[in-house]
């Protein structure tokens, strides 16, 4: 994990092509144009998009933000964590998660939540291996607009 820490940085607009590819690998197809439009989030002080660089390009990213709700103290929440297929199992996911935790602590947050699709077993095993614990099971509903 330590070897990756020096390769993690804040995202830039020119990362859009790689972020689109990585998002698609995760199962959320996105075009470069769509990602460029979404990168307006880089201006949000309560959000951080961290990218890991490798010799062969962008190896992964993590999207973390402050979640503010009426019913509890603010907490950090991971919106997405993607490690490119060639880099899985090399400690990059743990390094990205540690960087997101550092970012959250620096903002005085005491919790970092990560939601993982119940159908994806691999991420569950990863999160438990790096010390995360399950705090709730839930369903996500979408209301048609």
Language-model features: where?
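Conserved active-site alpha-helix within GNAT-family acetyltransferase domains
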Residues: 94, 118-137
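Conserved acetyl-CoA-binding loop-helix of GNAT-fold acetyltransferases
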Residues: 80-83, 89-102, 125, 129
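Conserved beta-strand-loop-alpha-helix junction that forms the acyl-donor binding cleft
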Residues: 114-123, 142-145
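Conserved GNAT acetyl-CoA-binding A-motif
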Residues: 104-116
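Acetyl-CoA-dependent GNAT
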Residues: 4-6, 10-74, 79, 84, ...
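Residues that form or flank phosphate/diphosphate-binding pockets in enzymes
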Residues: 30, 73, 91, 122, ...
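Conserved amphipathic alpha-helical interaction elements at protein-protein interfaces in regulatory
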Residues: 25, 89, 102-106, 133
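Short hydrophobic/aromatic beta-strand or adjacent loop that forms the aromatic wall/cage
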Residues: 47, 136-140
